[in-house]
């Protein structure tokens, strides 16, 4: 049988351990060498965290904490917090739209009893009653009126230890803080023409973008950090915010140190990162109402942009990590929408963007230190995707958004179709944004994140502006390349090849002839006949087999055999300790792992489903251990694999180990197994469905899970190539005799071939479904 290939791989995979050990010893021996550190090593100094040194500022980066600035009167931009840092009690800030809102904030020192004080607000002397009963905290209070000649009312007090306050114009409102630190929260006042509100500050202040509101709240509650990473050291006039320094350019190459052979160069670059997401949408076979997968894929993008009057050619690769798997099941009918898995990126996910351009900075990016980067944030919003059903209104997925925030940078290598590029990998953390996403015309709504269905929303690319700085050790002669291989490989060319090969394999399912497949499944395929279709020399055949076995021994199938071996040892020892007691648990647990679950067989259907599903996961190994004359799922799996290997034009010795291992794990995921007891058949599938029925009438009988567990231990396990539903359908439409039914139950290959040659639509459809399940 074709499944012999899997048995050979399981049997022989241990033999590669010796060659691995010899290789490891040799590698350790040859790599134990002494290296002369040279003049650029820092081995004589204590451990230290290297920083970027002087990184020239540019207008592309929006600082988190911009300031401090001197007191002034101006119209703050919408969507920016003004963080006020007063040093004395009195009026802190005032603002008005000259229509229906006059608002000011007053600071009151601790331990002030109720009293009237005179404040100058909008140039007018005002008598206001104030108090602060706190012994330690300062009190900010908002005073507001809605007419120019009206009286002031007090709102939203803030008791503050750090003595900081903030105000922002956004969304038709004026936002402030209230409560008590360290638990202060934001509030707001409605105002018409809010964007025209002019504000006058009477203390030093900072400017913080709304995207960093969490940072602003942290400052309000806990105070500014002791060492502030701000633009200015002392307060400057606000007009200095728009003055561009011409002392140094943002894009320059600086010689840090130099000897006769080597030099250290600092590269400062402004960059524009453009990227896009790619996705894979796979429909299941059948009537057209089922989708098996909607997932993210790495995406390459090449573009040009201008930097200091010079055209730059850049290349990016965007990939995601930490995806969240969602699913949707509209019902049990064949015409109900089903999405087995669709990926969503959320706040626990990361986006990686590998960036390369044709500037001098990337030419010798091998020995690098002091790598630092600053990048702006960007919001990625999803679009529509229609689930095109054959009949009825189409559901569609819409919405979803995340914002990307810079979280680090490291070296990487990008692999294109022609060349590998030393590049920078920018890591972005995610935050969910409005709007939420939903599957319209279903009950799925109000979910947050960015689904993989349409992550680009019709855009050609997303864009992020930023800059980076690094110091690179390069040859003093600019005509020389750094004599070493690629720096840090984080995305292998093999992954790209495997992705293309998986797509080709899945497409080849339509080209397999069923009659030939049955004949091929009956052949005793071994490793050499399986791999003979690959275009390689005979000398490489042994190496290919060794590499396949090396990969196969780490597969889930090999791990299951190892776990089963331990279980059998435990079962044998328990029997020897208590040989007089033969319980279901002691005899079955090695194969079924349900010794603790069969305490209440008739409790509920869900309990039986759980138990049969647990048993079914190990029936594949049981079937391998007790080979019968019938055909099994692994025979079909191996035959499909062999056919696709022979037809493939992209298969290579490098990709074969991964493909064979994946095929053993992923081909035909939905399997059903049966045991026969006289005229009764017990059938259970890996997804928890179970049937018990009589052979002569196909009439269902109660399913006895304990009897099924006993039969699994003592009787041969048979792959349900033609499952119960197909058998019942065949009997209802065509009628089959008892002997013919037994042959189909035993998966007799001769009978299966006869039905296929007779072009029986029910049997052909079942075999087609199994072939379509052979996907990677």
Curated annotation (Swiss-Prot):
Disulfide bonds: 203-216, 318-380
Motif DGE motif positions after renumbering to this chain: 308-310
Region (Spike head): 65-224
Region (Spike body and stalk (antigen domain)): 248-479
GO biological process: permeabilization of host organelle membrane involved in viral entry into host cell; virion attachment to host cell
One of the record's GO cellular component terms: host cell plasma membrane
Keyword set includes Coiled coil: yes
Keyword vocabulary terms for this entry: Capsid protein, Coiled coil, Disulfide bond, Hemagglutinin, Host cell membrane, Host cytoplasm, Host cytoskeleton, Host endoplasmic reticulum, Host membrane, Host-virus interaction, Membrane, Outer capsid protein, Viral attachment to host cell, Viral penetration into host cytoplasm, Viral penetration via permeabilization of host membrane, Virion, Virus entry into host cell
Stretches for region Spike foot: 510-776
Superkingdom of the organism of origin: Viruses
Annotated site residue numbers, Cleavage: 231-232, 241-242, 247-248
InterPro entries reported in the protein's UniProt record: ConA-like_dom_sf, Rota_A_VP4, Rota_VP4_MID, Rota_VP4_MID_sf, VP4_concanavalin-like, VP4_helical
Region (Hydrophobic) location: 389-409
Pfam family, one: Rota_VP4_MID
Note: In group A rotaviruses, VP4 defines the P serotype. Some rotavirus strains are neuraminidase-sensitive and require sialic acid to attach to the cell surface. Some rotavirus strains are integrin-dependent. Some rotavirus strains depend on ganglioside for their entry into the host cell. Hsp70 also seems to be involved in the entry of some strains.
Sequence similarity: Belongs to the rotavirus VP4 family.
HAMAP family according to UniProt: Rota_A_VP4, Rota_VP4
Protein name: Outer capsid protein VP4
Species of provenance: Rotavirus A (isolate RVA/Dog/United States/Cu-1/1982/G3P5A[3]) (RV-A)
The organism's taxonomic lineage, starting at the top: Viruses, Riboviria, Orthornavirae, Duplornaviricota, Resentoviricetes
């Amino acid at each position: 049988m074709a499944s012999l290939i899997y048995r050979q791989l399981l049997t022989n995979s241990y033999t590669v351990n010796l060659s691995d050990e010899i290789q490891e010893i040799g590698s350790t021996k040859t790599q134990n060498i002494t290296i002369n550190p040279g003049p650029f090593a820092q081995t004589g100094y204590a451990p230290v965290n290297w920083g970027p040194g002087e990184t020239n500022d540019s207008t592309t980066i929006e600082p988190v904490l911009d300031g401090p600035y001197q007191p002034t009167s101006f119209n703050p931009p919408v969507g920016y917090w003004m963080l006020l840092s007063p040093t004395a009690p009195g009026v802190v800030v005032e603002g008005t739209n000259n229509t229906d809102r006059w608002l000011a904030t007053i600071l009151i020192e601790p331990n002030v009893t109720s009293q009237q004080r005179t404040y100058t607000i909008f140039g007018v002397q005002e008598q206001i009653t104030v108090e602060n009963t706190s012994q330690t905290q300062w009190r900010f209070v908002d005073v507001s009126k809605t007419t120019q000649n009206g009286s002031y009312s007090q709102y939203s007090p803030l008791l503050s230890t750090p003595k900081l306050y903030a105000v922002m114009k956004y969304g038709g409102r004026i936002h402030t803080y209230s409560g008590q630190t360290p638990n202060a929260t934001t509030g707001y006042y409605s105002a018409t023409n809010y964007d025209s509100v002019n504000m006058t500050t009477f203390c030093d202040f900072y400017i913080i973008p709304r995207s960093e509101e969490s940072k602003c709240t942290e400052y309000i509650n806990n105070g500014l950090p002791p060492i502030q990473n701000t633009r200015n050291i002392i307060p400057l006039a606000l007009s200095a915010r728009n003055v561009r320094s011409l002392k140094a350019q943002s894009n320059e190459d600086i010689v840090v140190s130099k000897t006769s052979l080597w030099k250290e160069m600092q590269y400062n670059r402004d960059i524009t990162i453009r990227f896009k997401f790619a996705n894979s949408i796979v429909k299941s076979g059948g009537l057209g109402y089922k989708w098996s997968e909607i997932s993210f894929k790495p995406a390459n993008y090449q573009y040009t942009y201008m930097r200091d009057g010079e055209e730059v050619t850049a290349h990016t690769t965007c990939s995601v990590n930490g995806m969240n798997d969602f699913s949707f099941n509209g019902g049990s009918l064949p015409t109900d929408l089903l999405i087995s898995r669709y990926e969503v990126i959320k706040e626990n996910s990361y986006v990686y963007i590998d960036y390369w351009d044709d500037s001098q900075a990337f030419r010798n990016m091998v020995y690098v230190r002091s790598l630092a980067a600053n990048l702006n944030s960007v919001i990625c919003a999803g679009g529509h995707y229609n689930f095109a059903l054959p009949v009825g209104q189409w559901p569609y997925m819409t919405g979803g958004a995340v914002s990307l925030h810079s979280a680090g940078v490291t070296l990487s290598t990008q692999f294109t179709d022609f060349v590998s590029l030393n590049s920078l990998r920018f890591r972005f953390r995610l935050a969910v944004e409005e709007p939420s996403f939903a599957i319209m015309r279903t009950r799925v709504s109000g979910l947050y994140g960015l689904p993989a269905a349409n992550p680009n929303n019709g855009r050609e690319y997303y864009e992020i502006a930023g800059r980076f700085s690094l110091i690179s050790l390069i040859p003093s002669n600019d005509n020389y390349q750094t004599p070493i291989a690629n720096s840090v490989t984080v995305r292998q060319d093999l992954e790209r090849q495997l992705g293309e090969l998986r797509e080709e394999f899945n497409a080849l399912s339509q080209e397999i002839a069923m009659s030939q497949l049955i004949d091929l499944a009956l052949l005793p395929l071994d490793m050499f006949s399986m791999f003979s279709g690959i275009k390689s020399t005979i000398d490489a055949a042994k190496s290919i087999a060794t590499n396949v076995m090396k990969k196969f021994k780490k597969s889930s199938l090999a791990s299951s055999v190892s776990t089963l071996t331990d279980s059998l040892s435990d079962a044998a020892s328990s029997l020897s300790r208590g040989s007089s007691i033969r319980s279901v648990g002691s005899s079955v647990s090695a194969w079924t792992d349900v010794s603790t679950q069969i305490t209440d067989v008739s409790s509920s259907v869900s309990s039986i489903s759980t138990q049969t599903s647990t048993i079914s996961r190990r029936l594949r190994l049981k079937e391998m251990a007790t080979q019968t004359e019938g055909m099994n799922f692994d025979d079909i799996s191996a035959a499909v694999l062999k056919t696709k290997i022979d037809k493939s034009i992209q298969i290579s010795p490098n990709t074969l180990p991964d493909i064979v291992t994946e095929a053993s794990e992923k081909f035909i995921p939905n399997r059903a197994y049966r045991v026969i007891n006289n005229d009764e058949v017990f059938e259970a599938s890996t997804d928890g469905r179970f049937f018990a029925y009589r052979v002569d009438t196909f009439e269902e009988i109660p399913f006895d899970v304990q009897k099924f567990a006993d039969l699994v231990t003592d009787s041969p396990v048979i792959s349900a190539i033609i499952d119960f539903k197909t058998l019942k359908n065949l009997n209802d439409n065509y009628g089959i005799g008892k002997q013919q039914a037994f042959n189909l139950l035993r998966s007799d290959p001769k009978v299966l071939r006869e039905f296929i040659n007779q072009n029986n639509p029910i049997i052909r459809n079942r075999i087609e479904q199994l072939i379509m399940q052979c996907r990677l």
